[in-house]
């Protein structure tokens, strides 16, 4: 089973090109003004064009209202929505039907009990994303450069499709894949030289680290 790789929080043509050339299956644009990775729909639309036919364009939002989402979907024409806030199962279902787009629902993980939150979303969200629970007082639900105990994911049913996120970088991706066998990975701050500033060299290094990890004889989840 091929590994899905999402580079998230892209803001420049150079970073998008590096992600696509490296083999990203998904590229993410963040629409959340409090984030240093925030981008306007118009700017994202210009960058998104390069991904057509090459990667899944993901619009990442945090408890966005219908008006904001209408503008994002109309302008950017994403292939998928990622909901990274406190959206309820009913909200996820509503947005799937409103925009006729698949939805990836993000969850913040710190301890085993946090995984129980996904139960009401099964059969509604198309995919899950597991990120580290943000530090106390943080206004950002993701992109904080911290990881969680990957061993917790061993309790997941084998049929759950998800992306692993939170503190991934070229130095730890092999261990993350070995411990989780994750079907997908999501990286943002791990390929930045400063918050919100993607570094082409770090993106290239990350893809090389993934390739090296994939060459190792471990079994990925079926």
Swiss-Prot record:
GO BP: L-tryptophan biosynthetic process
Traced from the root, the source organism's taxonomic lineage reads: Bacteria, Pseudomonadati, Pseudomonadota, Alphaproteobacteria, Hyphomicrobiales
Q: Name one GO molecular function term.
A: phosphoribosylanthranilate isomerase activity
Q: Which InterPro entries match?
A: Aldolase_TIM (IPR013785), PRAI_dom (IPR001240), RibuloseP-bd_barrel (IPR011060), TrpF_fam (IPR044643)
Q: What is this protein called?
A: N-(5'-phosphoribosyl)anthranilate isomerase
Q: List the gene name.
A: trpF
Q: What is its EC number?
A: 5.3.1.24
Report the enzyme's class at the first EC level: isomerase
Which reaction equation describes what this protein catalyses? N-(5-phospho-beta-D-ribosyl)anthranilate = 1-(2-carboxyphenylamino)-1-deoxy-D-ribulose 5-phosphate
Matching entries from Gene3D superfamilies are given as: Aldolase class I
Q: Which cysteines are joined by disulfide bonds?
A: none
Pathways involved: Amino-acid biosynthesis; L-tryptophan biosynthesis; L-tryptophan from chorismate: step 3/5
**Transmembrane portions of the chain:** none
Instruction: Report the source organism.
Output: Brucella canis (strain ATCC 23365 / NCTC 10854 / RM-666)
Q: Which family does it belong to?
A: Belongs to the TrpF family.
């Amino acid at each position: 089973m091929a590994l899905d790789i999402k580079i998230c929080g892209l803001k420049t043509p150079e970073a998008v090109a590096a992600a696509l050339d490296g083999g990203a299956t998904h590229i993410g644009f963040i629409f959340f003004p409090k984030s240093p990775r925030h981008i306007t729909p118009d700017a994202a639309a210009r960058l998104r064009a390069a991904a057509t036919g090459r990667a899944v364009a993901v619009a990442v939002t945090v408890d966005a209202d219908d008006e904001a989402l209408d503008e994002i979907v109309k302008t950017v024409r994403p292939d998928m929505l990622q909901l990274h806030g406190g959206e309820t199962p009913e909200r996820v279902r509503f947005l799937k039907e409103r925009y006729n787009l698949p939805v990836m629902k993000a969850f913040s993980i710190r301890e085993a009990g946090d995984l129980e939150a996904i139960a009401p979303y099964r059969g509604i969200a198309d995919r899950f994303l597991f990120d580290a629970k943000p530090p106390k007082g943080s206004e950002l639900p993701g992109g904080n450069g911290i990881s969680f105990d990957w061993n917790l994911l061993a309790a997941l049913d084998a049929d759950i499709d998800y992306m692993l996120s939170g503190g991934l970088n070229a130095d730890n991706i092999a261990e993350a894949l070995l411990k989780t066998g994750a079907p997908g990975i999501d990286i943002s701050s791990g390929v930045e030289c400063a918050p919100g500033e993607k570094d082409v060299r770090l993106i290239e290094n990350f893809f090389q680290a993934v390739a090296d990890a994939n060459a190792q004889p471990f079994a990925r989840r079926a």
